[in-house]
Amino acid sequence: MKGISGRETRGLPLGALIPCVDNTGAKMISLIDVKALHTVAKRIPAAGVGDMFIASVKKGTPEMRSKVVYAVVVRQRRPYRRADGTMIEFEDNAAVLVTPDGEVRGSEIKGPVAREAAERWPRIAAISSTIV
């Protein structure tokens, strides 16, 4: 995992239901906690593009349901600014399941992946079909 510079707009708060866009068997996951997030007291934790978070599988195959997993945000609907000044927003929110070390659990990713997530997580960039 590489660090990212600058501020990032976090668009997925605690409890958000996020579609899982890989082929692990999970369809919908709920955000429980964001890893390595340091904020002010009593602020609701939120995740943005490229953040790793802990989630619970809400919909999916019977083997995956109600499991606690790690995931990385690859798309978010809330607009965020890149270093060159452009504003980026996707049509949907999406996440990919990973191991605690950052290895991708699936073998394919459906849809585009944000460049910020691909730069931070090389394993996600390796299996993504489109990087925006």
Swiss-Prot record:
Family matches, as CDD domains: Ribosomal_uL14
User: Which proteins does it associate with, and in what oligomeric form?
Assistant: Part of the 50S ribosomal subunit. Forms a cluster with proteins L3 and L24e, part of which may contact the 16S rRNA in 2 intersubunit bridges.
- What exactly does this protein do? Binds to 23S rRNA. Forms part of two intersubunit bridges in the 70S ribosome.
Q: InterPro entries per the record?
A: Ribosomal_uL14, Ribosomal_uL14_arc, Ribosomal_uL14_CS, Ribosomal_uL14_sf
Which Pfam families is this protein grouped with?
Answer: Ribosomal_L14 (PF00238)
Choose one Gene Ontology CC annotation of this protein and give it.
cytosolic large ribosomal subunit
The record's section on NCBIfam families has:
PRK08571.1 (NF006344), uL14_arch (TIGR03673)
Protein's recorded name: Large ribosomal subunit protein uL14
Q: What PANTHER family is this protein classified in?
A: 50S/60S RIBOSOMAL PROTEIN L14/L23, LARGE RIBOSOMAL SUBUNIT PROTEIN UL14
The membrane-spanning stretches of this chain are none
Ordered alphabetically, the record's keywords are: Ribonucleoprotein, Ribosomal protein, RNA-binding, rRNA-binding
- Which organism is this entry from? Picrophilus torridus (strain ATCC 700027 / DSM 9790 / JCM 10055 / NBRC 100828 / KAW 2/3)
**Source domain of life:** Archaea
The UniProt GO MF terms for this protein read: large ribosomal subunit rRNA binding; structural constituent of ribosome
Picking any one GO biological process from the record gives: translation
The UniProt similarity line reads: Belongs to the universal ribosomal protein uL14 family.
